[in-house]
């Protein structure tokens, strides 16, 4: 059984998508030509630009190329730390005794002193804002006992997020041949961090932090240059070049860019800004349906009820070229014969969103409630109905 849900509007473009069988739609309009220029050329070795809500890759180059993450590693370090906070395993007020290893870490520092006690909250700020390698190791040791064991945790989280081309050896990003990631994996991580921990994500927008009488400023200069930018993290080593993961929100649209392997701190800012401006200028994101919203009904045989509502497990967003919303088409395909029992969230069909005959999203339609088996009499009655339905179909009636 196929039901077509479509909207190709010319006048009512401001309306939300609706089911075709609930309105009388005009004849299909000819697709409106749209021109989207190619992404800007960048000086980055690898980059990716995605929409946060839909996950659509808007532009990319060498997004699966294995690279050294440098201090972008600390995005995962922070993700693990915040998960530990959320799970109640540590608290912001925990006092951490600074080990000699943490104190003597090379590279960027928050200038903690060996043997002194520092709160988890201050260490997080020292890691996120000041990119302190000393703070990162201190947090790793507090959570896992050693940086090596903490790296195992990092890899477990990477695996759970689907970061299939990433492997961590430390909490800082200091060079190691077995410590690597990709632009796409970093975008997955950034998206997960923002989605799961929106309150803690606000730490990444802070421009400065003072500890032990020393004020240091966030190295992400886009926080000053572009008011829509509210994170995330810079990175640099000689071998990795200058890197930056950025997120920006304008109106209801949030983009995430990852720029890797540029030649200078100034260049990573310029290339990131190029990508963000391109995405916001030429694309738009729409929320089509909410999770759990009743979108259609499926016929249920041999059940206590004859129909069940269908919807989506998650909110459905699509990212499309600007001005193309009215050319979206939505179709649903529902399984032709569904017999009780039916579980809640059981897949019973599929929703397809297309733009100008190109599929841009496919999601499962799931039952919004369970349906129990009907009585013996109800089963017999439905079996008779199915028999007649089959005979009529065979006769072409």
Where are these regions (language model features)?
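Positively charged n-region of N-terminal signal peptides that target proteins for export
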Residues: 1-4
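Domain-terminus/edge residues, biased toward the C-terminal soluble/receptor-binding domains
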Residues: 163-167, 175-180, 184-397
